[in-house]
From Swiss-Prot:
This is Trehalose transport system permease protein SugA. The lineage of its organism: Bacteria, Bacillati, Actinomycetota, Actinomycetes, Mycobacteriales. It is found in: Cell inner membrane. PROSITE patterns: ABC_TM1. Pfam families: BPD_transp_1. It is a multi-pass membrane protein.
Length: 307
């Protein structure tokens, strides 16, 4: 082996050893938090999984038995599950899309505001600081016929909360109003990392505001965008409060979380309710996995390229 080859091999081994040492350090730093998380969450998840494999109804406590995947079969062949899943996915897709567009616009405004920047940020974040149930009731009363200021704008005898599509539209509005500030806050953090010199150089080169946004700003804040979309998608998929207050899940407006609540706390069916919660957990895990695979290193937990 020549001296050049020896130096090359030494450099490769050095980089490999450095990477392994870096990963060992990362595992050591993460281990305490990971162990605490496992200790707190492993038992509830495991117990829910165990209950999902049993016929367990509190109304008939003496009729408990292990039935394997029977509860999952019952759920997956039932139209109520698929209706609730479709409603959940529709609310998630529409609300997160609108929140991203509005959140990006608000983030750009807050980032560029020169006077009263703190006041603008505080005003934008107020809706996010309101308890979801309180905000939901404010929307509920606003759309109640006869007393609601928004319902009074509609034709006489209109009751939007008694119809599926109008109800889902109101749920989306409530979601967007409440959580757009969260989206804008995450995107604002990403905008702070965009070099002003780069934007000025693009402007000098004749790039329009739209091209600076699409060719410079958005690519550079991609990690912040992915984090914001991932967190909001997972949160929106588990929607419960707004639907529970506004419609109670009636008229085919219930989400998968509402379906689980109805089976567990209204029907006292611990087995079916636990199975639904496990399915929700599985759906959330699949969504997170898809985000990581689609966006790679930009997604939380993604593997950096070349590593």
């Amino acid at each position: 082996m020549t001296s050049v080859e020896q130096r090359t091999a030494t450099a490769v081994f050095s980089r490999t050893g450095s990477r392994m040492a870096e990963r060992r350090l990362a595992f050591m730093l993460v281990a305490p938090a990971a162990m605490l998380m496992v200790a707190v969450t492993a038992y509830p998840i495991g117990y829910a999984l165990w209950l999902s494999l049993q016929r367990n109804n509190l109304a008939t406590p003496n009729d408990t038995a292990f039935i394997g995947l029977g509860n999952y079969h019952t759920i997956l062949i039932d139209r109520y599950w698929w209706t609730a899943l479709a409603v959940t996915l529709a609310i998630t897709a529409v609300s997160v899309t609108i929140e991203f567009v509005l959140g990006l616009a608000l983030a750009l405004v807050m980032h560029r505001t020169l006077i009263g920047k703190g006041l603008v940020r505080t005003a934008v974040l107020i809706p996010y600081g309101i308890v979801t149930v309180v905000a939901s009731y404010s929307w509920y009363y606003a759309w109640t016929p006869g007393t609601g200021y928004l319902a009074n704008l509609l034709p006489y005898d209109s009751a939007p909360l008694t119809q599926q599509i109008p109800s889902l539209g109101i749920v989306v509005i409530a979601e967007v109003w409440k959580t757009t500030p969260f989206m804008s806050l995450l995107l604002l953090a990403g905008l702070a990392l965009v070099p002003e010199d780069l934007l000025r150089a693009a402007q000098v080169d004749g790039a329009s505001a739209w091209r600076r946004l699409t060719k410079v700003i958005l690519p550079m804040i991609k990690p912040a965008i992915v984090v914001a979309l991932l967190f909001r998608t997972l949160d929106a998929f588990r929607i419960f409060d707004n639907i529970y207050v506004l419609t109670g899940g009636s008229n085919n407006t219930g989400s998968v979380s509402i379906l689980g609540y109805d089976n567990l706390f209204k029907g006292f069916n611990v087995g079916l309710g636990s199975a639904i919660s496990v399915l929700i957990f599985g759906c959330v895990a699949v969504i997170a996995f898809i985000f990581i695979k689609l966006f790679g290193a930009a997604a939380p937990g993604g593997e950096p390229s070349g590593r």
